[in-house]
Every structure is written in C-alpha cells, then in structure tokens.
Swiss-Prot record:
<keyword id="KW-0963">Cytoplasm</keyword>
<dbReference type="GO" id="GO:0005739">
    <property type="term" value="C:mitochondrion"/>
</dbReference>
<dbReference type="GO" id="GO:0000122">
    <property type="term" value="P:negative regulation of transcription by RNA polymerase II"/>
</dbReference>
<dbReference type="InterPro" id="IPR017222">
    <property type="entry name" value="DUF34/NIF3_animal"/>
</dbReference>
<dbReference type="Pfam" id="PF01784">
    <property type="entry name" value="DUF34_NIF3"/>
</dbReference>
<keyword id="KW-0007">Acetylation</keyword>
<comment type="function">
    <text>May function as a transcriptional corepressor through its interaction with COPS2, negatively regulating the expression of genes involved in neuronal differentiation.</text>
</comment>
<dbReference type="GO" id="GO:0061629">
    <property type="term" value="F:RNA polymerase II-specific DNA-binding transcription factor binding"/>
</dbReference>
<dbReference type="GO" id="GO:0030182">
    <property type="term" value="P:neuron differentiation"/>
</dbReference>
<protein>
    <recommendedName>
        <fullName>NIF3-like protein 1</fullName>
    </recommendedName>
</protein>
<comment type="similarity">
    <text>Belongs to the GTP cyclohydrolase I type 2/NIF3 family.</text>
</comment>
<dbReference type="InterPro" id="IPR002678">
    <property type="entry name" value="DUF34/NIF3"/>
</dbReference>
<dbReference type="InterPro" id="IPR036069">
    <property type="entry name" value="DUF34/NIF3_sf"/>
</dbReference>
<feature type="modified residue" description="N6-acetyllysine">
    <location>
        <position position="108"/>
    </location>
</feature>
<dbReference type="GO" id="GO:0005634">
    <property type="term" value="C:nucleus"/>
</dbReference>
<comment type="subunit">
    <text>Homodimer. Interacts with COPS2. Interacts with THOC7.</text>
</comment>
<keyword id="KW-0539">Nucleus</keyword>
Length: 376
C-alpha cells in the first residue's frame, strides 16, 4: 500500500513548500546589501566590472524573496515577477555599458523599466564571486577530483594596512628645529606622522616616519627640499597591499593523483551536467595522456589563463587563436560554453546564502535561466 505522501501531486507539494517559505520574515534592502558584502566583498571585483546594486526601487524597500539567476533575460524576468521576487541577484550584470536613455526600444532597457515598475531591486556580484574563496572558480574546481588549489592571479587586500600608499622617512639632528618640522608635517592633510629616537652617524637624532598619499607626498617633499640636509637623508618606500592567498581570479589546481584526460573529461561532464563539451588536444597529447595540473577560469578564460603552465585549461570560452597557442605548447583545452561553467554554482550559492541570512528570507533559483548556445 502506498503512503499518503506519494499520493500528493507535485504541484500541490510545490504550493505547500511555497506557502511555508513565504512565512519567513523580511530584510531591509540596506541590511541585505551589507550582509551580501560581508559574504563576498565587492572590492574583489575587477576594476572594469559593473557590480553591486544596479537597480534600486524608491526607499524604503524590504526583501522577502531573493531570486538567483546567472543571466537576467526577459524570460527570466517574467519568472522572477511571477514568483513575486523583491530582489534579483544576477551573476552577470544586466547593465554593463552606460545607458543614454531608458525606453522600450532594447531588451536591457525593458528589464530596467520592468524592475522599477514592479519594485524589484537588481544586484550583480560577477567577478567578486569569481575571486571569492567560496566562489564560482572554487566550485568549478570541485569537479576535478581531490586537489589543492590557489588563485592564478591573487587579489590584494582591499585596504592599505596604514593610511596612504607611501612611507617617507628622514632624520632630524639636534641643530634642527624638530618642533617646526613636526608642526608643518601635521598641518598637511592626509598624513600620519610618528617619531622615535635613533642613532645615526654616531649622534643622537630623531627619526621621522610618515605615511601619505601620492598627492601629499609631493607637498611633503616640497617642504623638505627647503632644507638640504633633511632632503638628502629622505627615504621613500612604496606600500603595497598584501596578497590574499585564497582570493583571486582563476584557479591553478594540482590533483593528488594524476588521471587520464579521458577520465578528466567525464568528471567535468558529470560536474557540469553536460553531455558534450569541446576539446582541443595539445600537440603530442592523446585521450590517455595524464593530467596532473589544471588551470581553470569560469566564463571567458583567455586572458586569465594566458601563459599559465598546466596540463589542461578548463574554461567556458577562449578565442580561436588562444586555443591554438595553448595547444602548440602541449596544453589540452576544454571549452564548455561561457555560462555552463558558472550556472551550477548558483545551487551551492542558494544553500550558502540561506545559512548566511539565517533563513530570514526566501531564496529561489531560476528554472528558465540557461546558456543561449545548444549543441544540435
């Protein structure tokens, strides 16, 4: 005899699930944005990218349902509105190039109009999620098998450890007016000044150290140049933001155990749920050639992977000539189409955000979002 659970139609189960989810509380838009930045800082996005809140309804705006998609198309927007979304997180920014007008003439302008008319916020993390330790590239690497990974191009810390990008140091001897020097330096905006005793050239002196910006550096040097002794003993150091070991673009993955290219292909197909992918064999390689090191980049990996030493490049798309260049070096190349290397991450993101937001809001995944290219 079948249990009653098996007799409930799927549509009814979905409706019941929707009712349960809809009972959750709301989040204020500003609080949600702050929490999203805590999850993965937008400061890690590439400088050319357009990330963050792209469409904002008039305040106040509260969010009950967050809708996840890889690409915000007109079909996906229809789905988001049908599911009463208040906030769309679109991995790819639907607004990238500047818009000179908002009319019904182009599909992207229509998206903006529909979002505003229906009070739906639109947000894109894009390359910030590529760089994140728990982001898209790290998810893509999970399909390779047990391996150690590191970013191909590590990100730098978002802020300098101290104020300013330059450190300037010099010594003041007893014959010079220390108070005047310190007073003048502290009068320059954007400068952090410290002093400490030091012994230089056999005499007791005061060592002055200050951090400053490029602009204030020129002001400080103009002052010091008035005293030849001070100016000639001045040292300038450039301060760099420290590299972050687990954050950055692309991933270089070293497998614990080498596998044949044929086995690696099947692993990637399984992980991405693809029946086909595109393969360029490296010169002198076969399907039985061993793969130990994989360099990967979700989406378009040509610039990120260029010049990286590996047995295999894995990405969504590369230019014809980049593929030829890699193959000439004996590097195998696997292309899976751009968004096929990204979209699967959203299921994992849905779970992570649920935990991050302590299940305060509904988080749903688009069912209509798909890569525009198909193998026919």
């Amino acid at each position: 005899m079948l249990s009653s659970a098996h007799l409930v139609p799927t549509s009814v189960q979905r409706a019941q699930s929707w009712i349960c989810r809809s009972s959750r509380s709301f989040m204020d838009l500003k609080a949600l944005l702050s929490s999203l930045n805590d999850f993965a800082s937008l400061s890690f996005a590439e400088s050319w990218d357009n990330v963050g809140l792209l469409v904002e309804p008039s305040p106040p705006h509260t969010v009950n349902t967050l809708f996840l998609t890889n690409d915000l198309t007109e079909e996906v927007m229809d789905e988001a509105l049908q599911k009463k979304a208040d906030f769309i997180l679109s991995y790819h920014p639907p607004i990238f190039r500047p818009m000179k007008h908002i009319t019904w003439k182009t599909w992207k302008e229509c998206l903006v109009i529909r979002a505003l008319e229906n009070r739906v916020a639109v947000y894109s993390p894009h390359t910030a999620y590529d760089a994140a330790p728990q982001g898209v590239n790290s998810w893509l690497a999970k399909g390779l098998g047990t391996c150690t990974t590191r970013p191909i191009h590590p990100s730098r810390a978002p802020d300098y450890p101290t104020e300013g990008a330059h450190r300037l140091e010099f010594s003041v001897n007893r014959s010079q007016d220390l108070d005047k020097v310190m007073s003048t330096l502290r009068g320059v905006g954007g400068v952090s000044v410290t002093s400490f005793p030091a012994r230089c050239d056999g005499e007791e002196q005061t060592r002055i150290s200050l951090n400053c910006t490029q602009k204030t550096l020129m002001q400080v040097l103009a002052f010091l140049s008035q005293d030849r002794q001070l100016y000639q003993k001045t040292e300038i150091l450039s301060l760099e933001k420290p590299l972050l070991l687990h954050t950055g673009m692309g991933r270089l993955c070293t497998l614990d155990e080498s596998v044949s290219l044929a086995i690696m292909i099947e692993r990637i197909k399984t992980h991405l749920k693809l029946s086909h992918l595109r393969l360029a064999l490296g010169v002198g390689r076969t399907l039985e050639s061993q793969v130990k090191v994989v360099a990967l980049c979700a989406g378009s990996g040509g610039s990120v992977l260029q010049g990286v030493e590996a047995d295999l490049y894995l990405t969504g798309e590369m230019s014809h000539h980049d593929v030829l260049d890699a193959a000439s070096k004996g590097i195998n190349v696997i292309l899976c189409e751009h968004s096929n290397t990204e979209r699967g991450f959203l299921s994992e993101l849905q779970e992570m955000l649920g935990v991050h937001f302590e299940n305060k809001i509904n988080i749903i995944l688009s069912e209509t979002d798909r890569d525009p290219l198909r193998v026919v």
